[in-house]
Amino acid sequence: APMAEGEQKPREEVKFMDVYKRSYCRPIEMLVDIFQEYPDEIEYIFKPSCVPLMRCGGCCNDESLECVPTEEFNITMQIMRIKPHQGQHIGEMSFLQHSKCECRPKKEKARQENPCGPCSERRKHLFVQDPQTCKCSCRNTDSRCKARQLELNERTCRCDKPRR
């Protein structure tokens, strides 16, 4: 049977350039705990409890550099949200994926280079910021809020009750 890409036969030697290319800084699928992305939603149990996301990972081959995202986008996934003793429903949740990664100077140096102020002092997890333009956008989507009979507040990025 033909082998899947990346699959190795037992005791096969992997060539240096293959090892180097596959270990260098790049977007790679990682399993991310939903509570890491939504730390305030402790009243729910999520099924699944983690999701596969493309995130930057790998080596930069220089101690002063780190692998960081240079392009990101949101992806919406259907997740079961369970509220113990109250019920469950499948709803949409938005997650950040990395589409491009680069080796950049580590945070101490990057902090002076980063002219962007934070999107919000409180509830930082509700916002996504473009590192190039400093533009802030909401992780929540209008359709996600509407599915819960709520509307997206663009200023706070929260789903609020519609005003009458």
From Swiss-Prot:
Output one GO MF annotation.
chemoattractant activity
Tell me which Gene Ontology terms the entry assigns under biological process: induction of positive chemotaxis; motor neuron migration; positive regulation of angiogenesis; positive regulation of cell division; positive regulation of endothelial cell migration; positive regulation of endothelial cell proliferation; positive regulation of focal adhesion assembly; positive regulation of mast cell chemotaxis
Pfam families annotated for this entry?
PDGF (PF00341), VEGF_C (PF14554)
Listed InterPro entries? Cystine-knot_cytokine, PD_growth_factor_CS, PDGF/VEGF_dom, PDGF/VEGF_growth_factor, VEGF_C, VEGF_C_sf
State its location(s).
Secreted
**Keyword line:** Angiogenesis, Developmental protein, Differentiation, Disulfide bond, Glycoprotein, Growth factor, Mitogen, Secreted
One of the record's GO cellular component terms:
membrane
Which PROSITE patterns has this protein been placed in? PDGF_1 (PS00249), PDGF_2 (PS50278)
Please give the residues the UniProt entry marks as glycosylated: 74
S-S bridge residues: 25-67, 56-101, 60-103
Q: How does it assemble?
A: Homodimer; disulfide-linked. Also found as heterodimer with PGF. Interacts with NRP1. Interacts with BSG.
Give the protein's biological function: Growth factor active in angiogenesis, vasculogenesis and endothelial cell growth. Induces endothelial cell proliferation, promotes cell migration, inhibits apoptosis and induces permeabilization of blood vessels. Binds to the FLT1/VEGFR1 and KDR/VEGFR2 receptors, heparan sulfate and heparin. Binding to NRP1 receptor initiates a signaling pathway needed for motor neuron axon guidance and cell body migration, including for the caudal migration of facial motor neurons from rhombomere 4 to rhombomere 6 during embryonic development. Also binds the DEAR/FBXW7-AS1 receptor.
Family to which the UniProt record says this protein belongs: Belongs to the PDGF/VEGF growth factor family.
- Report what the protein is called: Vascular endothelial growth factor A
Q: Which organism is it from?
A: Cavia porcellus (Guinea pig)
Its ancestry begins with: Eukaryota, Metazoa, Chordata, Craniata, Vertebrata
